[in-house]
């Protein structure tokens, strides 16, 4: 994946459309296509990758944060439908914070929080999946950030995210 950094009014629309195609359209289509077969067999687990960003407002990265929120809400919604139909199929969401990947270079951002290794995130995620968890957030600091975001007013979270992102300009 990749992000588009900058004021929404100034960011490149073509890059944002590619971001939406990657983070929203592809996830939606692939989930729908794979889910049908899994439901027929009553077996399977789809893991969609969201982000801690999907739980926060995202000034200066509006398209990215919004796309990750879509992934989280889509997955949660489908999973609830599956549970209500007594299906054994699950749709999970991985909600990581910074992970050491090429994303930072492509998005041209630096993270204030310590990045987790991709190996740690993968092992943690598989462990939680095998235990039937569907809302997976690796890292204590990211879990804490997610909790604070949940109990904070949106306008306060927006201001904090803006100040944090602004330092990257």
Identify the residue ranges that each predicted region occupies:
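C-terminal helical subdomain
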Residues: 93, 110-146
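Substrate-binding pocket helix/loop in short-chain dehydrogenase/reductase
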Residues: 5-8, 15-18
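Residue(s) in the substrate-gating loop at a strand-loop-helix junction
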Residues: 51
């Amino acid at each position: 994946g990749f992000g588009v950094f900058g004021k929404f009014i100034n960011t490149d629309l073509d890059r944002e459309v590619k971001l939406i195609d990657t983070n929203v359209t592809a996830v939606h289509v692939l989930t729908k296509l794979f889910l049908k077969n899994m439901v027929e067999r009553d077996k399977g687990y789809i893991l969609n990758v969201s982000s801690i960003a999907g739980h926060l407002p995202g000034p200066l990265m509006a398209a990215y944060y919004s796309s990750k929120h879509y992934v989280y809400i889509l997955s949660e919604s489908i999973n609830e439908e599956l549970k209500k139909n007594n299906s054994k199929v699950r749709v999970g969401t991985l909600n990581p914070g910074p992970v050491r990947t090429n994303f930072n270079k492509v998005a041209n951002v630096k993270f204030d929080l310590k990045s987790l290794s991709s190996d740690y995130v993968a092992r943690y995620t598989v462990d939680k999946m095998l235990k039937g968890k569907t809302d997976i957030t690796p890292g204590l600091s990211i879990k804490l950030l997610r909790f604070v975001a949940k109990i904070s007013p949106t306008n306060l979270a927006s201001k904090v995210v803006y100040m944090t992102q602004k330092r990257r300009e």
